[in-house]
Swiss-Prot record:
Disulfide bridge positions per record: 37-85, 60-81
InterPro entries named in the record: Kunitz_BPTI, Kunitz_BPTI_sf, Serpin_venom_toxin
Protein name as it appears in the record: Kunitz-type U15-theraphotoxin-Hs1e
GO cellular component labels: extracellular region
Residues with site note (Reactive bond for chymotrypsin): 47-48
Family, per entry: Belongs to the venom Kunitz-type family. 03 (sub-Kunitz) subfamily.
Location (main, coarse): secreted
Coiled-coil ranges from the UniProt annotation: none
Biological source species: Cyriopagopus schmidti
Site (May bind Kv1): 39
Upper taxonomic lineage: Eukaryota, Metazoa, Ecdysozoa, Arthropoda, Chelicerata
Note, other: Negative results: the recombinant toxin does not show activity on Kv1.1/KCNA1, Kv1.2/KCNA2, Kv1.3/KCNA3, Kv2.1/KCNB1 and Kv4.3/KCND3 channels, as well as on calcium (Cav) and sodium channels (Nav). It also does not show detectable activity on thrombin.
UniProt function note: Serine protease inhibitor that inhibits trypsin (Ki=9.61 nM), kallikrein (Ki=24.8 nM), and chymotrypsin.
Keyword list, A-Z: Disulfide bond, Protease inhibitor, Secreted, Serine protease inhibitor, Signal
Domain BPTI/Kunitz inhibitor: 37-85
Length: 88
């Protein structure tokens, strides 16, 4: 029983790393922190459908967010997205 739990934990950790690691590689870092505006669009799990905004490197673009998961490059309005991510 202990071996099965250990293998399940290793499998879960592996899946989480496979999902998270590529997004972190594509992100930019400032002062050791991830710049959320450089993260890719991530709709999360599609349990619901919310119209949200993400910064695509140039401007803010609409996308459908599933309501769970995803990353922090997600804003409720275009104005909030531009305020956080647009460079003056």
């Amino acid at each position: 029983m202990g071996t099965a739990r250990f293998l399940s934990a290793v499998l879960l950790l592996s899946v989480l790393l496979m999902v998270t690691f590529p997004a972190l590689l594509s992100a930019e870092y400032h002062d050791g922190r991830v710049d959320i505006c450089s993260l890719p669009s991530d709709s999360g799990d599609r349990l619901r459908f919310f119209e949200m905004w993400y910064f695509d490197g140039t401007t803010c673009t609409k996308f459908v967010y599933g309501g769970y998961g995803g990353n922090d490059n997600r804003f409720p309005t275009e104005k909030a997205c531009m305020k956080r991510c647009a460079k003056a």
